[in-house]
């Protein structure tokens, strides 16, 4: 909801949740939590585009926001809105879908977040 509220304020169309993108985001959040590393590169993947393709989604473009800390989703989305780079991903006009994933690190306190934004290839 918060992501679409940000987009609406700027005259952009809302995004629809997508199960494939949520799977890609959740897998990446788990990978980051397992390694205790915040990175757009995962084990065995070159980046978000490759991870999204592995789910079967056929992207035209893909963007990703990541974060880690003792925060809930509302705080993470607020921080992404305050960051010009993260906000730019949320505001890409062409994106149509999103998926969010989270994983808790072994310390039981640090939450790793990944949000994937994408648009499918045109047929």
PLM feature spans:
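Non-transmembrane alpha-helical segments in soluble domains
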Residues: 4, 26-33, 77-81
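Intrinsically disordered, low-complexity
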Residues: 1-20, 108, 119-123
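Divalent metal-coordination and catalytic microenvironments
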Residues: 7, 25, 100
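Loop/turn elements at helix/coil->beta-strand transitions in domains of secreted/extracellular proteins
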Residues: 8-10, 57, 62, 96-98, ...
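Short glycine-/small-residue-rich flexible loop motifs, especially phosphate/cofactor-binding loops
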Residues: 4, 49, 87
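Short, surface-exposed glycine/acidic/tryptophan-bearing loops
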Residues: 19-71, 90-92
